[in-house]
Amino acid sequence: MGLLDSEPGSVLNVVSTALNDTVEFYRWTWSIADKRVENWPLMQSPWPTLSISTLYLLFVWLGPKWMKDREPFQMRLVLIIYNFGMVLLNFFIFRELFMGSYNAGYSYICQSVDYSNNVNEVRIAAALWWYFVSKGVEYLDTVFFILRKKNNQVSFLHVYHHCTMFTLWWIGIKWVAGGQAFFGAQMNSFIHVIMYSYYGLAAFGPWIQKYLWWKRYLTMLQLVQFHVTIGHTALSLYTDCPFPKWMHWALIAYAISFIFLFLNFYIRTYKEPKKPKTGKTAMNGISANGVSKSEKQLVIENGKKQKNGKAKGD
């Protein structure tokens, strides 16, 4: 007998039981959350983070429409300050995670979460919180693209990366602000020091961009990062590391999604035969702000790059 054929009382009992189970599960998950971070900014409830992410997606949708009949903003100085500010923030996070984990005697193979108020554990939790905040700040990458009318840079990879990182790391900080979580954040913040250094230098314009030949290796570095993440997480599962298994499996699935997306980007950008360029050059799908130039802005004369007209958006 199906649910629709059941007595009304039976249906209500099923619905009531399901609702009660959901409420109990919600209360249970909240009861095992990290007490150290519960009163930190943005951590009392998921709604501020979800609201910020929703506003971000609305801007991704409405921003290009608003800019359609407007001139792109000239943001060279803003981009230089922003990118090098992100270099400093990510270096701070990397340093705090490295020093905190070193002083706490963390293992890079397997490390459970210590929810105590030990000074090094709190230092690691705070650094991870700053890492989470940095992912919210990175929403500005997209804002700057749209204000500069670089809409071709706002790809699915770009939006997927930014929106999911900020949202999912709220979960990470709420329940596992320490232990194995330090490894991925430490590695990623170090890579972002390199990335934002590149973007900050590139924002100065064509006179320095010609020396930044290593752009393609940023994507390769990110691909290596995701493979290392999968290997490290798989090793933790193999050794039965006392860290939440659901987070291990979720991290593996998340890293695999990035491998496919970044590999697709890398092949399309660097491996496929180049088509005659009629617009803007390909850029890193994540946060290549301050770098792109249209072909009409740069011409090759006697082997040297020269400006041909005023560049917009830089």
From Swiss-Prot:
GO terms in the biological process aspect are: fatty acid elongation, monounsaturated fatty acid; fatty acid elongation, polyunsaturated fatty acid; fatty acid elongation, saturated fatty acid; long-chain fatty-acyl-CoA biosynthetic process; sphingolipid biosynthetic process; unsaturated fatty acid biosynthetic process; very long-chain fatty acid biosynthetic process
Q: What is its EC number?
A: 2.3.1.199
Post-translationally, this protein is described as follows, namely: N-glycosylated.
Provide the transmembrane region boundaries. Answer: 42-62, 78-98, 127-147, 165-185, 188-208, 217-237, 247-267
Quote the pathway field.
Answer: Lipid metabolism; fatty acid biosynthesis
**Region called Disordered, residue ranges:** 274-314
As its record notes, the protein acts as a catalyst of: a very-long-chain acyl-CoA + malonyl-CoA + H(+) = a very-long-chain 3-oxoacyl-CoA + CO2 + CoA; hexacosanoyl-CoA + malonyl-CoA + H(+) = 3-oxooctacosanyol-CoA + CO2 + CoA; octacosanoyl-CoA + malonyl-CoA + H(+) = 3-oxo-triacontanoyl-CoA + CO2 + CoA; triacontanoyl-CoA + malonyl-CoA + H(+) = 3-oxo-dotriacontanoyl-CoA + CO2 + CoA
Q: Does the keyword Transcription regulation apply?
A: no
Q: Where in the cell is it found?
A: Endoplasmic reticulum membrane
Is Ribonucleoprotein set as a keyword in this record? no
Looking up InterPro entries in the UniProt record yields: ELO_CS (IPR030457), ELO_fam (IPR002076), ELOVL4 (IPR033678)
Q: Where is this motif: Di-lysine motif?
A: 310-314
The membrane topology term of the UniProt record is:
Multi-pass membrane protein
Where in the body, by tissue, does this protein show up?
Answer: Expressed mainly in retina. Also expressed in skin and thymus.
Task: Extract the GO molecular function terms from the UniProt entry.
Answer: fatty acid elongase activity
Gene Ontology cellular-component terms for this entry are: endoplasmic reticulum; endoplasmic reticulum membrane
**Glycan attachment sites:** 20
Where does this protein have compositionally biased stretches of type Basic residues? 305-314
Enumerate the PROSITE patterns for this protein.
ELO
Keywords (A to Z) from UniProt: Endoplasmic reticulum, Fatty acid biosynthesis, Fatty acid metabolism, Glycoprotein, Lipid biosynthesis, Lipid metabolism, Membrane, Transferase, Transmembrane, Transmembrane helix
Q: What is known of its domains?
A: The C-terminal di-lysine motif confers endoplasmic reticulum localization.
What is the role of this chain? Catalyzes the first and rate-limiting reaction of the four reactions that constitute the long-chain fatty acids elongation cycle. This endoplasmic reticulum-bound enzymatic process allows the addition of 2 carbons to the chain of long- and very long-chain fatty acids (VLCFAs) per cycle. Condensing enzyme that catalyzes the synthesis of very long chain saturated (VLC-SFA) and polyunsaturated (PUFA) fatty acids that are involved in multiple biological processes as precursors of membrane lipids and lipid mediators. May play a critical role in early brain and skin development.
Q: Which family is annotated?
A: Belongs to the ELO family. ELOVL4 subfamily.
Q: How does it assemble?
A: Oligomer.
Q: Which HAMAP family match?
A: VLCF_elongase_4
Full protein name: Very long chain fatty acid elongase 4
- Which source organism? Macaca fascicularis
